[in-house]
Amino acid sequence: VTDTALSPEEQLIEDIAGFTHDPLGYALYAFPWGEEGTELAHATGPRQWQADAFREIRDHLQNPETRYQPLMLARASGHGIGKSAFISMLINWGMSTCDDCKVVVTANTDNQLRTKTWPEIIKWSNLAITKDWFTCTATAMYSNDPGHDKRWRADAIPWSEHNTEAFAGLHNERKRIIVVFDEASNIADLVWEVAEGALTDEDTEIIWVAFGNPTRNTGRFRECFRKYKHRWKCAQIDSRTVEGTNKQQLQKWVDDYGEDSDFVKIRVRGIFPDASELQFIPTGLTDEAMKRVVTAAQVAHAPVIIGVDPAYSGVDDAVIYLRQGLHSKVLWTGNKTTDDLIMAKRIADFEDQY
């Protein structure tokens, strides 16, 4: 043995440092896959969809062009695919491979956070080869490195529309930030907006993951797959395609409720339901209608009708629409106004034009 030989702990630190931008490599190295007597005795590694998501993170971080741009991952899925396990492995990698990493975890309800999401994070931390590096409590995981317990930590934080300060303080410049929204469909839009506004540190690795069953057809989680899909890396995962799910139970649901029922869409297929509680026309019908091609000759006989949604309440923009037979198009969309004269002038101008 030479003087330069590393101690087992020093060798571990060096090995783990090699996975700074490789969460899949870390997961395969750090957890006791296939080891008898452990909870992972019958598993050979992360599930396929988990490995794919880890590769997305790896590719984002290993590319200097994208490394310091926020990476936002959204996954809508049915039941039993291993969302909590993925979140737990992600957090353990993030904390173990970056000094003073900051992690914030929230969920749809305080009960979900305390009894499901966070206990799973603790379980995986205790399985990891780096378990002695951190202390876990009922609401936090922090570094045992002297003087780092306040800066190098993960916290379970219940959200409230009346108390969003916890998500406004997500600054960790030149380090790493991980934000986790579990069962994201039922986290209020305001919390999303506050969290988004905080992710502005430069030269910082920022990863935001939003997972859950697609229970609602409205809200920010839904818009990750629609209005903001150019910002989020999205996937919708059918539980029947994932290793380790109870295929018989899933098939019973399909048999009982039907493949196209909202129950199966939400709990099996990872697809958002057709209609929300505030929606009159199901999304499936409008999606089909928007794909149809209508020629000018087909609607030449029909009168031109102008429709107006002034959007006096709610968060949507005001809209002026034209309809002629089965043809329709947006004429104008913009900020709402309570000045009726301004809107009347806009409408009159379009009446003159058409």
Stretches with model-predicted labels:
Residues 2-308, 320-328, 333, 345-354:
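Phosphate/NTP-binding elements of NTP-utilizing enzymes
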Residues 332-340:
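Short beta->alpha junction loops
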